[in-house]
Regions:
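N-terminal anchoring/stem segment of glycosyltransferases
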Residues: 1-64, 84-86, 255-268
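C-terminal catalytic/acceptor-binding lobe
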Residues: 207-268
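Conserved glycosyltransferase catalytic-site signature
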Residues: 16-19, 69-72, 76, 154, ...
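A conserved donor-nucleotide-binding helix/loop in the catalytic core
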Residues: 21, 62-91, 101
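Conserved donor-nucleotide/metal-binding helix-loop-beta segment in metal-dependent transferases, i.e.
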Residues: 99-135
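Catalytic core and acceptor-binding pocket of nucleotide-sugar-dependent glycosyltransferases
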Residues: 146-233
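The conserved acidic donor/metal-binding loop of glycosyltransferases
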Residues: 94-98
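Short, flexible, basic/aromatic active-site loop/helix in glycosyltransferases
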Residues: 133-148
Length: 268
């Protein structure tokens, strides 16, 4: 069974609203007999009435975040925990996302032969760490390579239990870089991408059936769409009548309106 995994920590309403919207879009794709939705949270009681399996991560947040130094570290640590606990494939989804038709079929097919990530981002992703070296538990000596180092976006992370050693190495690399996390907040996805590169693990991208709207303008637009189209009742998981579409001019127009109203509101 494929386990879809969401993460909620910190208790911020805007992020929980994004999770709700994404999860509702995912539900429309799934046969409950063939897939499970997991929600990992430091406030598990929030999800007690949802048709999901809840993972209580409150006891782990401090350790998984490197003592609070880098909260993005929780993501690979959580994927590792879910793989170990369920001994089945796990597909982590960032909450700022919309699942589109065909996603489950695409994910199921691609995860049979590859690790799934959202999309390729760039070569030589962190030039200032040129010369960085560390030792990883499975791969051994690592050196940042300006010619070959790369990074994929980790809005999706799809892995199977046999990939656990890859996560051990990813977490070790993150820990070696954690002192630079404030300057380079993407080290979580960089570390996993590098371990996949060095182990020559196949990577499959999913971006047509998975919309990841992490950029600022699109996120502001989506906050308004979620507010307008979902029930304010937390446990009401009724889908919106129409799913949000990321049309460029609609996003620009709403952000202009949003900016003007904020400025005017400051003078009232």
């Amino acid at each position: 069974m494929l386990n879809y995994l969401y993460l909620d920590y910190g208790g911020k309403a805007k992020y929980r609203a994004e999770l709700k919207y994404s999860l509702i879009s995912l539900q429309a794709e799934l046969d409950p007999a063939r897939a499970r939705i997991l929600v990992a949270s430091d406030a598990p009681e929030v999800y007690r009435n949802w048709p999901v399996t809840v993972m209580d991560i409150a006891p782990h947040v401090r350790d998984w975040s490197g003592g609070g130094l880098y909260y993005h570290r929780i993501k690979p640590a959580l994927v590792r925990e879910a793989l170990s606990r369920f001994s089945e494939p796990v597909l982590f989804l960032d909450s700022d996302s919309i699942v589109r038709p065909g996603f489950h079929a695409e994910a199921t097919e691609k995860m049979t032969a590859a690790v799934v990530m959202n999309r390729f981002e760039k070569q030589n992703p962190i030039p200032p760490i040129r010369g960085f070296r560390t030792r990883l538990p499975h791969l051994g000596e690592y050196r940042y390579d300006v010619a070959h180092s790369w990074m994929y976006n980790s809005g999706l992370i799809g892995m199977a239990p046999q990939h656990l050693p890859l996560l051990d190495d990813s977490l070790a690399m993150i820990d070696a870089l954690i002192g630079r996390a404030k300057k380079f907040p993407m080290i979580e996805q960089f570390a996993l991408s590098e371990v996949l590169r060095l182990t020559q693990t196949p990577i499959a991208e999913i971006h047509d059936s998975f919309l990841h709207y992490w950029q600022g303008r699109r996120r502001i637009y989506m906050a308004n769409q979620i507010r307008k189209t979902l029930s304010p009742e937390w446990d009401d998981l009724t889908p919106p009548k129409e799913w949000a579409q990321m049309h460029y001019w609609k996003i620009r127009a709403y952000n202009y309106y949003h900016g003007v109203t904020r400025v005017l509101g400051a003078f009232q």
